[in-house]
Amino acid sequence: MFTDPMPLLTVSDGTAIIQLNRPDQLNALDYATIDMLMRYLDLLETDETVRAVILTGSGRAFSAGADIKGFAASIAAGPEVALRDLVRRGQGLTRRIESYPKPIIAAVNGLAFGGGCEVVEACPLAIAADTARFAKPEINLGFPPPFGGTQRLPRLIGRKRALQMILTGDSIDAAEAQRIGLVNMVVSEEQLMIAARALVAKIAAKPAVAVSACLASVTRGINSAIDEALAVEASQFARTVVTQDIHEGIRAFMERRPASFTGR
């Protein structure tokens, strides 16, 4: 039985919103929360009415990172248990987010530290409130980021900037996060969910298979050698050739009219 509040899930107008819901713990990612996020993602992947997912937090934090108090027992039990319970779980979540076939947009409403920052890194798109802050404070606890942050952050912002954040634990504000490429845009706190929904609406108007193909091409390609990445791009292009939407898109272009996509 879960004793802590679980993430909230709402679905409307083709958009799923997952809200981390442990505000008193700054939405720290304990085992139960991670497991429930994975269940939600499994559920939403097969729901054809859902075109995109918005991930946000309640209270003043997006997520302050791993629930260290809860993970302490795993760490105390030694490397094998810590790797099984903590690292594989956390990396499994961020890998699931990164490779998800539908867009997941991080709507960063406040602190995104440690594992919370790693979740943002894994999301293909991110919008931050102007009050948000980002940090990699794991070094102050004696370990490196374990949820994929040592690999994704350098790919996003460059090796030197990433190492400065990882080795110092210093935080950056939302404007700096946008400048270095950690988030796409910064808006006021009041406009955060409005901006996230607007981005979802723009993407949802595009052909669903093509959106999924673009996500797969970029995510898988950026982690591959160029020849392998080009093969991924070609295979994803082939996915779209058999769809109705590609023919509709080409006809609409030739006829100089807006396309009417069906997701087929």
Locations of the language-model features?
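Conserved CoA-thioester-binding segment of acyl-CoA-metabolizing enzymes
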Residues: 1-58, 81, 92-95
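Short, charged, surface-exposed hinge/linker loops at domain edges
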Residues: 215-224
